[in-house]
Structure formats: C-alpha cells, structure tokens
Amino acid sequence: MAYEIILGREEAEREKFGTLGSVLIGKHYVQMGQTTALAQNIYLDLNRAHVVFVCGKRGSGKSYCMGVIAEGIATLPEEQRSRLAVVLLDTMGIFWTMKYPNHKDEHLLQQWNMEGKGIPVKIFTPTGFFKKYKQEGIPTDVPFSIRPYELTPEDWNLTFDLNPNEPLAIFIARIVLTLQKQRDDYDVEDIVEAIQADAREEEHLKNAALNRFRSVEAWGVFSREATPLKDLIKGGQVSILDLSPYAVMPGGWKIKHLVIGLVAERLFIERMIVRKNEEFKSIHSAIHYLITEEEEEEERLRGKEMPIVWLMIDEAHEFLPAQGKTAATDALITLLREGRQPGIAMVMATQQPGKIHTDAMTQSDVVLAHRLTAKVDTDAMGSIIQSYLRGTLDKELTLLPRVAGSCIAVDDVNERMYPMQIRPRFSWHGGGAPKIVEEKKKALEF
C-alpha cells in the first residue's frame, strides 16, 4: 500500500487514524530521471483546526484550491461532516457555481476515478440585493444582514476612512456611544435621527455625517433582525457569503471589510463559549466513568449547534494588508493567533503574498504555494519556508510542471515539503477567465 501523505497531521495520529477525518486534495509529484509523474495521494487533515495559506499569481489555481477543500468537507461521511461547517467569503461571486456538476472536465475527472457532481451549498446574499437576485434568476438562498448595534465607533471610522482624531470621527463616535448607552438596539435610521437631533455640533459636520450614513442605507446589509449565526454555521453545511454586489460599488472593499470583520468576531466569541462547554464535558467524562445515553445525545446535539468552523477568505491581502489596517484586521489576526484553541480553522488565498500581513504567513501550518513570478512575492514566501528549501523558492517553483494547480505544499506540522498537483474539482468552477474563442461541441454521428 502506498504511503499516504496527510498535510497537518502528526505521525502518531496518521498511524492511529489513517486518512479518517481528512480530505483528498491532490497527488505528489515525483521525479524519475527526466520524467515528472504523479504518485501517492495527498490529503489535508481536518481533525484539528489549521491555518492554510494559498498563494500564487493570477490564474494559478488559488480559488480552485479553496473549492477543492470545501468540496472535500461537504462530501465527508455524515458522522464527520456534521461536526464541521464551512463559511466561504466570496468577494467576486464565483463560488455559487458549486451547486452544479463539473461536466467540462469529465475526461480529467475520469483519470482521477471521479465524476462530476454538484454540492448543496447555501448562498447568503445581503438583504438589500436578495429580492433583486431572485427576480433576475441569480442563484441565492437566504438573505444576510448584520445589526448596526454591533459596530464600534472604530468600525465606522475605518469604513468611512476617517482619522479617529479628526472632528467628524469624534462626532460619529459620540453619537454611536450615546446610542449604545441609551438603547439595547438601533438601526441606521436611528443614527441618522440622532445626528439630526444633536444640538452641540456644527452644521457642516452634521451634514458630513448624514451624507455618510445615508449612503450606508444603500448598502443593503444592515437590519435590526440580523442573520443568526446558527443559520450561517451549521454542521455539514457549506455557507457562501456572497459579497460580490459590492464589487462595483464606491468604497465596496470597505463594506466587505466591515462585514467580514464582524462575522469573524462573532465566530470567535461563539466558539469560545462552546469550547468551554466542550472542555467541561471532557473533564466531566474523565472524572465520571459512567455517562448516561441522555448526556451523550445532549453532547452530540450541542456539537451540531456550533461545529468546528472552516473560514475561507479569497483575496486575503485586501483584509489583512501588510501596511495599515481595515475593519477586518483585528478580528482576523485574533483568529490567526488564537483561533486554533476554540476550533476555528482558516483558509486564506492571495495573489500578492508580499502585500499581506506577516501573521497570515507565519501563523500558517500548511502552505500551498502556486507559481509566483513577482520578486516581492517570492521573497515574502521564501522568507517563511526557506528552511524547507534545497535552493531558492524561484528554483523550486520553476521545477513544477507548467499546469494550473501545480504547487509546493509545505507541512509545518511535520516540517516537510512536497511538490504536488491539486485534484480536479467535481463541482463547477466559476473563477475561470472569459475567452473569445470557444470550443465547439461535435455533433453526434449515427
């Protein structure tokens, strides 16, 4: 039997569990003379929370790779799948196609002993765009919204690109803090009314604040009735949070930062609470040898209510820049540094590793490095995986076959490196670039 490579799984656990609780993501490249061939399978461990960093230049297969991991989780056996949940933050609207089978790569799938099939993903669209999407036939399943009450003055100032010490930022902070002190909940209209009713501030500052919050109403993502986290995070469910409506909106990235930062913060808080309950249960079972069936069933149901979460972020450098910060930075750095213990795994993809926060790379225990050509990017990647390289990263990447999906996998848990090929997707990939020349289908001959 071929030796199975499981990225992120310690040798003792590999011998104990084999490939149980892992997903196939590709095959290992081996060099035989002048020939490069695909050898043993490479899996990704799901038994523990990992941080997976995926990088590569445009078109090298980063988003495709994220889809492969999400597919793998969605097709695990029920017992394992029910204890995991995927939240995929889709900034460009390319992952809804996972609902449909990959018929365009049927020949390639056959070579891997696979067949095309769709994944029952659940697509969340901002409330203000949900009805429009339904009317226009754009795939969506559930409206998504967040509560303005959950945002701090700093969140608003980062979103509006304001210096916290300038008069307008100070005024907005005063309004928001006053509302938080006086009310248990409020919406954007309440903020507008509070600004209009304020008698202390100068008129030009009030108008500047009003203009900003009037534009917020057009974002269509705020509501008193926020989407419950339990709807977004369900055992066995792949949730796609479609933020593509903001791709062409002025300041669209600021809105995405705000939404993702809040989702990440809520995830961390909820999983911390659940993790404490899980630890208490472990202590209880260690002390009390006899556990009733009712207690076992209660624990199983609790695990389904808030499973281990795999948070997947495309274009991660936009949310975690190397210089400065966004409304998502603090929450995401907290997950990177502390998310393992409460049970939050992350997959981050970027085409510019030279422009991403260093924590995104240094906190990663699995790295999938696709082809890179820009020196700033190869230098950034080479600095964190240099100890695994025989030469330079440029040289190692050059040795890879020039096909999409080829990459270098770095397993920091076992301190090993493998050249590999990502497996083909069995659901449709929506991230390909449009072409002006299309392949014509041949007519059937009888």
Annotate each language-model stretch with its function.
Residues 402-446:
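Conserved P-loop NTPase motor module
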Residues 7, 71, 335-418:
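Conserved ATP-driven motor cores of ASCE-family P-loop NTPases powering translocation/secretion/packaging/pilus
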Residues 61-62, 94-96, 130-131, 248-250, ...:
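Flexible loop/turn segments at secondary-structure boundaries
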Residues 55, 59-62, 66, 249-257, ...:
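Alpha-helix N-cap/helix-initiation motif
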Residues 52, 239, 347:
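Conserved beta-strand position immediately N-terminal to the Walker
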Residues 1-59, 64-83, 104, 116, ...:
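Basic- and hydrophobic-enriched, low-structure N-terminal and domain-boundary segments
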Residues 48-49, 68-334, 399-413:
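P-loop NTPase motor domains
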